[in-house]
């Protein structure tokens, strides 16, 4: 596998350096979608290419890429394989949270996470999503014996049957929360079978359950505190990376239309309009990453969602009936685009997308 790596073996998130990796991911995206298998080889390729080191500073063993450069990398990766890119967001979110903590456990695990020899994922969605309306935490933490006792479950953990570690959030009865790093072979931790999804089934996302799981003090990454995710590096849900993945998927879909437009002049204008919109969204994304105020992150997320859905459906229309046959990339992109309507989607963004779909937008 020739990834055209520099002398240190670590690829930077630039187009020339990532080209070999993204071509490999793109070639495997269709078979991965069809099989629903865990992308072992793709994740290994990313680890060997140094992708995990983008997210951590050199003082902790990474290369400390800027937020804008990381988003540039995500734009390329998601245009190649959304399933692999989504998995990376969860793994690197966990990695960044581990690297930012002063917990005693960090030094024992960080290098293996950076190299991809060990994998960690996030179990935090229940702290911010719809389960909150139940009034009772679905994953509780009870103080005792110098640590905490966890009971309950985390409903959406990506790669749960394959990861070595989980960064998990739990809530104490008084409303404070903790983040902890636990090995998946810890007594009392069990994994449900992954949920079959409309797309991205290969992410093997499912529930992880905790039955009287003892957490020692040295495994507490953050907390106890109220809203432990607020300001937590790498542990927040959603964000600009989600918009980057949607814009990257749109890039791939528009590319299909552009291919068809070479021999069909009626597709030239739609392809050009969508490409221009995608370019503006990309520039606004990178502007936000560098402190610009071209728009709000929420506004960009709504636009990115819309662009992903419209461009993928336009690609399906452009390739006609062939795109409706199982295995065609246009059909896969249509299904994958719908993921952005439900993945870490803030309510104002949901409302904006609903208004557009119902022709209620101004």
Where are these regions (language model features)?
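A generic N-terminal leader/anchor concept
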Residues: 1-64
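Amphipathic alpha-helix face/heptad-repeat signature
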Residues: 14, 243-246, 270-277, 300-307, ...
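Glycine-rich flavin
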Residues: 38-48, 52-151, 158, 358
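Glycine-rich phosphate/cofactor-binding loops in nucleotide/flavin-utilizing enzymes
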Residues: 322-362
């Amino acid at each position: 596998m020739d990834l055209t790596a520099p002398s240190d073996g670590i690829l930077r998130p630039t187009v020339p350096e990532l080209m070999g990796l993204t071509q490999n991911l793109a070639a495997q995206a269709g078979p991965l979608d069809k099989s629903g298998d865990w992308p072992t080889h793709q994740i290994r390729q990313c680890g060997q290419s140094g992708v995990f080191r983008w997210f951590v500073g050199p003082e902790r063993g990474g290369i400390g890429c800027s937020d804008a450069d990381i988003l540039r990398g995500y734009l390329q990766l998601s245009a190649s394989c959304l399933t692999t890119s989504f998995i990376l967001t969860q793994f690197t979110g966990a990695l960044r949270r581990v690297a930012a903590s002063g917990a005693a456990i960090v030094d024992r695990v960080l290098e293996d996470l950076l190299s991809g020899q060990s994998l960690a994922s996030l179990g935090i969605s229940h702290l911010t999503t719809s389960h909150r309306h139940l009034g009772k935490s679905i994953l509780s933490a009870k103080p005792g014996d110098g640590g905490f006792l966890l009971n309950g479950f985390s409903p959406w953990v990506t790669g749960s049957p394959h990861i070595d570690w989980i960064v998990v959030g739990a809530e104490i009865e008084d409303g404070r929360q903790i983040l902890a790093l636990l090995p998946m072979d810890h007594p009392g931790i069990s994994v449900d079978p992954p949920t079959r999804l409309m797309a991205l089934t290969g992410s093997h996302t499912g529930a992880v359950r905790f039955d009287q799981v003892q957490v020692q003090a040295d495994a507490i990454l953050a907390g106890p505190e109220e809203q432990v995710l607020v300001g937590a590096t790498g542990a927040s849900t959603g964000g600009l990376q989600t918009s980057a993945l949607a814009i990257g998927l749109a890039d791939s879909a528009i590319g299909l239309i552009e291919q068809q437009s070479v021999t069909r002049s009626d597709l030239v204008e739609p392809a050009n309009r969508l490409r221009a919109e995608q370019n503006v969204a990309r520039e606004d994304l990178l502007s936000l990453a560098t402190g610009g105020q071209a728009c709000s992150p929420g506004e960009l997320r709504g636009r990115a969602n819309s662009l992903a859905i419209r461009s993928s459906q336009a690609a399906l229309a452009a390739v006609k009936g062939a795109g409706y046959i199982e295995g065609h990339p246009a059909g896969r992109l249509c299904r994958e685009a719908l993921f952005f309507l439900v993945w870490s989607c803030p309510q104002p963004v949901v409302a904006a997308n609903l208004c557009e779909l119902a022709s209620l937008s101004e």
